[in-house]
Amino acid sequence: MPLPLAVHAQDRLLSLNIHEEPAIDVGHLIPGMKLWPLFLDPDNGTWVLYAHYPPGTRLPQHFHTGAVHFFTMKGTWGYKEYPQDMQTPGSYLYEPPGTMHTFHIPEDGEPVEGFMVVSGVNVVFDDEGNYLSTDHAGSMEQIFLDAARRQGIGMPRYIRPSGPAAFTA
């Protein structure tokens, strides 16, 4: 049997190292939060990030339309709704579509770092259950571009699949 033809010819691997890319400070949204965009695919609704959160961070309650995979590298964090299930270094968390929760880090804890793969949309609510916003790969990309511009970083380096759908001829 012959080998399959490569669909995408590559001269190099598509690889990023967070130690070689500047963090994007999104403290204007969540104080002290820094993110590294790794892969943003607005067409398919997938966003892959490395995140740094300071102690005391609390994200608004949010509903996931798609699955989330989160691997904790440093620190301890949890969801307000599941105090018995704190995540620690080495923890892998799978969040199925349709889940809703409130991320928090203890005030007396250490900074948290982790790697996440998010599919779909996060629908964000305030403490009273009122709709605030939707976060998705496209909106996150705009947040990163705006924050990088404000910080004078220039164009952040991340992997983005080829552009929007178009006719071939």
Sequence positions of predicted segments:
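Short acidic-glycine-tyrosine-enriched beta hairpin
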Residues: P42-D43, H69, G78-I105
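A short secondary-structure junction signal
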Residues: L49-Y50, Y82, D126-G129
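Glycine- and acidic-residue-biased ligand/ion/polar-headgroup-sensing regions
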Residues: P54-P55, H64-Y82
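Ligand-binding loop in jelly-roll beta-barrel domains
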Residues: Q84-Q87, P97-D127
